[in-house]
Amino acid sequence: MKTCAILCAAGKGTRFGGNTPKQFLFLKNKMIIEYSLEVFEKSHFIDGIVLLVPQGFEDIARYLKDKFSKVIFWDYGGNERADTVKRGLEILKGECDIVAIHDSARPFITLELLEKLIADVETHFAVAPGILANDTVKFVVDGHIQNTLPRSNICLIQTPQVFKFDLIYRGYEMFKNELFTDDLQYVERLGIKPKIIENSRINFKITTKEDLLIAEAIVEKGYW
């Protein structure tokens, strides 16, 4: 079965600030996006990668396509993450059986995790990594606690999220007017209960400058 990846790199990083989207900033001697691209490139399970970037960053897209042989196509993403993923799915329609969707601002994925997710999707249809909540979780409205959620049932979801292609494509088609915050929700709405693989907290998304400082420390200390 053919497996492809969609690498979402079209975010402008409004919460992060600055003129350069965070996925194109350098961590030591390479861009943040290159860390995850290296893992997808190395995996024997991955047959091709579609890269979605913001307008104005064509030179970076061309550079990455030249550097990584499995990047088969690049294009512009949309205004919202969901628009970007939908564009990637349209590009890959009819080209693969399984698709892995990953946020390029998560540099610290492992080959072991990626291939475990792909292997498990054969029987579970939709699989994603996640971490169990350590802190007590409150549901808050307008700055006031409404209730406390059971921590033992709370999981913080990461990427890559892996799907049978036809399933996630159908979810995006049926709920195309929704702007869910992750891709799992599109198949959950179809009645699927995705499988979660417990993963390391190091697979965090770089969203703020504080996150970047942590990522820099991880790389500088040789932990990655």
UniProtKB/Swiss-Prot annotation:
CDD domains: CDP-ME_synthetase. Gene3D superfamilies: Spore Coat Polysaccharide Biosynthesis Protein SpsA, Chain A (3.90.550.10). One of its GO terms (biological process) is isopentenyl diphosphate biosynthetic process, methylerythritol 4-phosphate pathway. Keywords: Isoprene biosynthesis, Nucleotidyltransferase, Transferase. It comes from the Bacteria. Catalyzes the formation of 4-diphosphocytidyl-2-C-methyl-D-erythritol from CTP and 2-C-methyl-D-erythritol 4-phosphate (MEP). This is 2-C-methyl-D-erythritol 4-phosphate cytidylyltransferase. The gene is ispD.
